[in-house]
A protein has these predicted regions:
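Conserved, mostly hydrophobic/aromatic
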Residues: 20, 40, 93, 101, ...
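Catalytic alpha/beta core domains of metabolic enzymes, predominantly
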Residues: 182-228
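Glycine-rich, positively charged N-terminal anion/phosphate-binding segment
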Residues: 2, 30-78, 84-92, 97-100
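Alpha-helix-loop-beta-strand connector modules within alpha/beta enzyme cores
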Residues: 58-82, 121-143, 164-169, 191-209
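N-terminal small/glycine-rich loop or linker at the start of catalytic domains
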Residues: 2-25, 102-115, 136-153, 198, ...
């Protein structure tokens, strides 16, 4: 979700082909995944995260994302993106001529270690290198923060930590800045507090927000974000 500079415009991005499918026990073939994405495009969606370039041993549901990309029709006016977690993922995106990547750093030490095997400070260094590679190859980039509103493992996450990470990312990334409620911990007041703090640094019109409905607050959180 992103609110445009025109306050009457809200952009929605479909992430189901990545965030949805990676949690499913059934592993779909690249052909089926590509067909799903094409059907989503046919609904009128203009922003779709088609998958991720990650270790297939860790996330087998995302194996073959390169083939998914090759199978797609690449409709004009649609922004196709992939999530990348390391430099190898960026290099795959470059090799496959994917025009847009998303790079995220967790604000939670525990989540960062479990997700990437790195402490936040080290993950941030890696992320800035990844963004630099993408930008130098003229790719679009969304740089962002996972667990920006709280963490399943650690509970609340200091907003100062989120702002610190965003400050480092936006210094090298000229594009959108993402704030992800990765484990569905956010409440509307959390949404407002974090967006206001980060927005004062980078501008609210650059922010995107990724939400979950884990505790039945997804719509309330969305409305809180749109109102800002």
């Amino acid at each position: 979700l992103r609110k445009g500079a025109d306050t009457n415009t809200v952009w929605l991005q479909e992430v189901g082909p990545r965030d949805g499918l990676q949690n499913e026990a059934v592993i779909l073939s690249p052909e089926v995944r590509a067909d799903l994405i094409e059907r989503l495009v046919d609904t009128g969606l203009s922003r779709i995260q088609i998958g991720s370039f990650v270790n297939p041993d860790r996330v087998p549901q995302m194996a073959g994302t390169d083939k998914v990309w090759k199978l797609l029709g690449k409709k004009a006016g649609v922004r196709y993106s992939v999530l990348v977690l390391n430099q190898r993922g960026v290099e795959q995106a470059i090799d496959q001529h994917v025009p847009y990547v998303e790079v995220f750093v967790s604000a939670s030490e525990t989540h960062s270690l479990k997700n990437s095997g790195a402490r936040v400070v080290d993950a941030l260094v890696t992320a800035t290198q990844m963004i630099g590679s993408a930008v130098s190859n003229r790719m679009g980039v969304t740089a962002g923060v996972m667990c920006a509103f709280g963490c399943f493992y650690e509970g609340s996450v200091p907003v100062e930590r989120v702002v610190e990470i965003v400050s480092a990312l936006e210094a090298i990334s000229p594009g959108e800045i993402g704030l992800a409620d990765t484990t569905g911990m956010a409440r509307p007041d959390d949404i407002k507090r974090v967006i206001e703090s980060v927005g004062s640094l980078v501008g609210v019109d650059r922010l995107t927000i990724h939400l979950h409905d884990t505790r039945g607050l997804g719509i309330a959180n969305l409305l809180a974000a749109v109102e800002l």
